Amino acid sequence: MKAILLLAIFSVLTVAICGVSQNYGNVRYNYTELPNGEYCYIPRRRCVTTEQCCKPYDTVNNFAACGMAWPEDKKRKVNKCYICDNELTLCTR
């Protein structure tokens, strides 16, 4: 019983000291219709140009891009939509 109590106290102290990490991958984006009648491509979807990708709501701190990435089959690189943070240089994948 004493070991369980010590483990619980240690866990609480660890969380209090280290904190909970933020998930920067969840940037909200504006799902809108494009001029050609299609809807914009969500992050991680294949794209040809950046104009096809959904733009973030916060355009001051974030931007959308179409960049190269390895697909799941890892045969060749493909273009995928990303939303990136200007300051942290983190992109959703």
UniProtKB/Swiss-Prot annotation:
Coiled coil: none annotated. Disulfide bonds join 40-54, 40-81, 53-66, 84-91. InterPro entries: Cys_Knot_tox. Keywords: Disulfide bond, Ion channel impairing toxin, Knottin, Neurotoxin, Secreted, Signal, Toxin. Expressed by the venom gland. It is found in: Secreted. Residues 1-18 form the signal peptide. One of its GO terms (cellular component) is extracellular region. Pfam families: Cys_Knot_tox. It comes from the Eukaryota. GO terms for molecular function: ion channel regulator activity; toxin activity. Probable neurotoxin with ion channel impairing activity. Belongs to the neurotoxin 27 (Jztx-72) family. ICK-72 subfamily. This is U8-theraphotoxin-Hs1b.
